[in-house]
Amino acid sequence: MSDQVKTNHKTTAKERPFARAIQTLRNVGLRPTRQRMALAKILFDGANRHVTADSLHEEIDKANITISRATIYNTLHQFTDVGLLREVVVDSGRTYFDTNVTDHHHYFLEEEGCLQDIPDGALTIGLLPEVPPGKKFSRVEVIIHVAKDS
């Protein structure tokens, strides 16, 4: 009887489509609101990716989900603050959010306007300047801008 009860009460990810998003948010101390769950599901239920607030807003619209740009922007920054995303500033007018939060570097493909991860081990950083007194390096981040070869 107990085996039958266990079998009947099992839940799977297919039965609970937001289970992973809810757990991800709770693990970092964020309340799983409807907007956060929708954004977490889109951002984290798949391969690592780079998004902007605008590209995410377009994706949300195509999925017939109503979330304001301001809420998307605020949520991206909340996710960054708790370590779920990494903010990558390409220039003063272009910020991307990366779901891969490990230390790694990027190509910025200028023609396409997108980021691409540089494979591990493809970039070696040699001599670094001295750190100001009382400071230490926290991270070295390289973004290589790539233009069309004409």
What does each model-identified segment do?
Residues 52-64:
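DNA-recognition alpha helix
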Residues 82-150:
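Non-DNA-binding regulatory cores of transcription-related proteins
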Residues 46-51:
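Short capping segments at the starts of secondary-structure elements
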Residues 72-82:
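Basic amphipathic alpha-helical segments that dock to polyanions
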Residues 38-41, 55, 74:
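Amphipathic alpha-helical interaction segments
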Residues 1-45:
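Intrinsically disordered, low-complexity serine/threonine- and proline-rich regulatory segments
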